[in-house]
Each structure stands twice: as C-alpha cells, then as structure tokens.
Amino acid sequence: IGFVFQTFNLLPRSTALDNVALPLVYAGLNKTKRNERAVEVLKSVDLGDRIMHKPNELSGGQRQRVAVARALVNHPSIILADEPTGNLDSKISIEIMGLFEQIHKKGNTIIIVTHEEDIALYAHRIIRLIDGKIASDEMNPHIKTYEESIKSVVDE
C-alpha cells in the first residue's frame, strides 16, 4: 500500500530523491538500488530535473508529485490518497488527477478521500459518507478524464 498525504509530509532537509527513497530503506534495499528506483519513479512523475531539490525549492504541485512518487516507489497495488489536491490550485489539481489516471491505467487501485465534488468525478466509484456512515455508493457513469479537464481549462 502506498499513501499520499494531503500536506505532502516530505522531510524538509532531504532532497526529492531521498524523500522518495526513504520507504525503500525499510524494504531493505541497498543505497544504489534505492536511488535507482527513486530516480525512475521521479522521472515517471515528470520530476527528473528536480531530483536534488529540497521541498522548499519546489512548487506545491511538484511537492505533491514527490509525495505521489514516494507512494509509488514500492510498486504498491493499492494507493490511498488523502485530499491529494486539497492544497493545490485547479490547474495543478488537474495535473495530479491526470497522474492518478495514468497510474490507474497501469493496474493500480487508487482510493481518494476528498471533499471536492469535481475531484470525486474522476473516480469510477463514488462512496459518500455522512457522519461516518455510507450515505450512497454509486458507479460513476461519466468518469472525468485529464484530457477533458485540461481542455476546459485551456478553453476558459
């Protein structure tokens, strides 16, 4: 299981590379293997040019992509994302949801917790909770895609 935090939870004095490689320490990989895999995953989230940057040198969207990369580095089949776009502007939110769309197409299950209806529309299934109880559980008949979303932003 990989986990994406709303507030990124990156180590402030560590580079993007070290933040992403951290879970691999606990997996028992040696430093060379950790760094190779971390670089590969950072490149997959379009941060190949930011590998040696610390969190304070990255934008909010870049920090969230580092957090996503960290969640992916152990090749989890399930990713839990807590308000992954909560601290981001709408354009960067669309980019993050596009990234999740790509990850899902590779076979990963992604569970997103959000209060934002427009973000929930990217899901195949939407479960709404009220006071901790399931209020509705529906399949989404029209799943929002990155392509649709980015086009609507460009058209505005």
Please provide the spans of the model-predicted regions.
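ABC family nucleotide-binding domain
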Residues: 1-122
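A generic structural signal for secondary-structure junctions
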Residues: 9, 25, 47, 128-134, ...
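Conserved catalytic segment of ABC-fold P-loop ATPases
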Residues: 122-128
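Conserved beta-strand-loop-alpha-helix hinge in the C-terminal portion
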Residues: 133-156
